[in-house]
Amino acid sequence: MVGVFRLEGHSVRLQSLRGIAALCVAVGHAFTVMRNGRIEDAHFTLRPGNALLAAGELLFQPNTAVILFYVLSGFVLGESLRRRAAPNERSHLGAFGVRRLWRLLPVMWLSILFAAAVAVLLRDATFAGTTSWFDQFSSVAVSPAILLENLLGLSHSINSVLWSIQIELVMIVLLPLMAWLSARTGLWLDGVMVGALYLGAIEFWGVVPNFVLFAYCFYLGAALPKFLSNAMVAR
């Protein structure tokens, strides 16, 4: 009988894959600055002048990369939860939360402060050839109250791309529950859970909070060891 697949220790390959996904997101957002080559636009027409940009956007597809990154996060963090020992469950979960906050908050705060400075310095500035998504950064409202709200992770109004970090913060609480549930269910029920969360995301897109929409990615990642084990048995 083959046991459940386990990730033992730090995996350079997995971390590299997460890094590639993060890089695709960053480069993909750079493409959203320019009007040419916006393949999401309903009126997009492929022309020689925008073909290179369109190809680059397909190669560095940020939406797909975000999903891959979240699945890998669910996998790596779920395995970290199972692997690390602690005197009791409360200490175990507390240590997990502290580690995650230490990794996420400093970078998030630095990004917010930089974006706030840019918003103040470039207030009402205009740039030729940029998209409305980029132009909105020159009209971002910045005040002590708004800054505090963003620093606490309650809003991403100053730097809109930080919606993805907000999801990671919520998952500090939800991922241990997902890992606990997946450890006590069968493979078929895991598949049903992932499918239900995915269909719910499609049905309620734009209605429910973002962390609900992407919960299926993290649950799939947490359950991935069982799917991998089943694939190895099938061989």
Write out the residue ranges for each language-model feature.
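Membrane-interface helix-loop-helix regions
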Residues: 47-58, 89, 93-95, 104-169, ...
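Aromatic-enriched alpha-helical transmembrane segments of multi-pass intramembrane proteins
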Residues: 15, 21-24, 138-235
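Short, Lys/Arg-rich, polar N-terminal cytosolic tail immediately upstream
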Residues: 1-13
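Transmembrane alpha-helical segments in integral membrane proteins
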Residues: 67-83, 122, 169-179
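Transmembrane helix-loop junctions in multipass membrane proteins, especially transporters and channels
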Residues: 37, 41, 83-85, 119-128, ...
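Functionally critical transmembrane alpha-helices in membrane proteins and complexes, commonly lining
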Residues: 12-82
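Membrane-helix interface linkers and caps
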Residues: 2-5, 77-100, 232
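Hydrophobic residues within membrane-embedded alpha-helical segments of Major Facilitator Superfamily
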Residues: 24, 68-70, 76, 109, ...
